[in-house]
Amino acid sequence: SILRVMKEKVDFFKANSGMGSIDYNTSSGQLTILNRKQQILYQRNNPDFDLFKEFGVNEEDVHHIQGLLHQTSVQNKEISATIKATVENNSQMYRMKLHTLWSPLKKDGYIGIIGYFDTVK
């Protein structure tokens, strides 16, 4: 099961290389965000931290993303959204795709989220 999830992550990031990436583990709270050059923009282990506030995402966008994530399932793993955020001191519109990771061992939701973000052209 862990090997399947790792392969799913590798395949997702390979298909979406050249963009900023997000990797979040729900059980540990470990979050890593990398920029296009694969440099760490943000890393944390505190599950109580408000990531959206850190990147200046407005409340409406936060609720929209949370609502979309709530609708994901083993069959419907991905969501897409366009949000305004501040990354590396640059506030602009970003499109993001989030892919939820699931395990048969956890019945009540996803075990992680991976994703990418890129500026809206």
Where are these regions (language model features)?
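Short, charged amphipathic alpha-helical "coupling" segments at sensory-output junctions
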Residues: 2-13, 120-121
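PAS-family sensory domain signal
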Residues: 9-54
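Glycine-biased flexible loop/turn sites that connect beta-strands or occur in inter-domain linkers
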Residues: 29, 89-91, 105-109
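Solvent-exposed interhelical
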Residues: 57
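Terminal output helix/cap of sensory domains in signal transduction proteins
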Residues: 60-84
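Short loop/turn elements at sensory-signaling interfaces that couple input to output
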Residues: 96-120
